[in-house]
Amino acid sequence: MAGARLFRFRDEPGPGADPTVLEVRVPQVLHVQYGMYVWPCAVVLAQYLWFHRRVLPGKAVLEIGAGVSLPGILAAKCGAKVTLSDSPELPHCLDICWQSCQMNNLPQVQIVGLTWGHISKDTLSLPPQDIILGSDVFFEPEDFESILATVYFLMQKNPKVQFWSTYQVRSADWSLEGLLYKWDMRCVHIPLESFDADKEDIAESTLPGRHTIEMLIISFAKDSS
């Protein structure tokens, strides 16, 4: 079992009331595979979930490229029906998903192998989702279309599904606009200050630091609601 890293999400109430605190522990491993440790985008996405935690109970939530699964674990602790997924070609990442569930006493969370852009038996068997999570999955430009193709497939099961994603700005030349148009999707940028994420230290973690993070909500363009 890997060492644990603790994240404490806090909601400061009005004067005289006790704060609401949620603790999440995830494995922390120094490993060449990206999914084996917490990236700055993950804590920002987890903060968005924490800020909107009252909408989560009973929702079907799928985290893609989950790795240590901080956002998905937080969603499960807030009452969502969570499935964690990562590449079946990266068994260490799937194992780290399992370790995260064990650390947080969440045996009900499902873990599946999912390859972006490929419709496997596991992908076909997924139930309709309400929310898809992805923190820093838009890392390699050659993966962008495969990610959106997978999201598009899931949108066919539930056209109202939303893809909540955080993205670390690494190049001004990278853009999703053309691919979103191709796959009939739209994107809304959510200001970090609207969910208390415009700071360098979230959940007592020293993350995201000084990195430039964007919060996106991607949905099916044909869903006018």
From Swiss-Prot:
Which GO cellular component terms are attached? cytoplasm; female pronucleus; male pronucleus; nucleus; protein-containing complex
- Keyword presence, Transferase: yes
Q: Which reaction does it catalyse?
A: L-arginyl-[protein] + 2 S-adenosyl-L-methionine = N(omega),N(omega)-dimethyl-L-arginyl-[protein] + 2 S-adenosyl-L-homocysteine + 2 H(+)
What is a single Pfam family found in this protein's UniProt entry? Methyltransf_16
GO MF terms held by the record? DNA-binding transcription factor binding; heat shock protein binding; histone H3R17 methyltransferase activity; protein-arginine omega-N asymmetric methyltransferase activity
Q: What is its EC number?
A: 2.1.1.319
**A single GO BP:** epigenetic regulation of gene expression
Q: Does the keyword Cytoplasm apply?
A: yes
Could you say which protein family the record assigns here?
Belongs to the methyltransferase superfamily. METTL23 family.
* Assembly behavior: Interacts with HSPA5, HSP90B1, TUBULIN, UGGT1 and UGGT2. Interacts with TET3. Interacts with STPG4.
What is this protein called in UniProt?
A: Histone-arginine methyltransferase METTL23
Q: Which organism is it from?
A: Rattus norvegicus (Rat)
> Source taxonomy lineage?
Eukaryota, Metazoa, Chordata, Craniata, Vertebrata
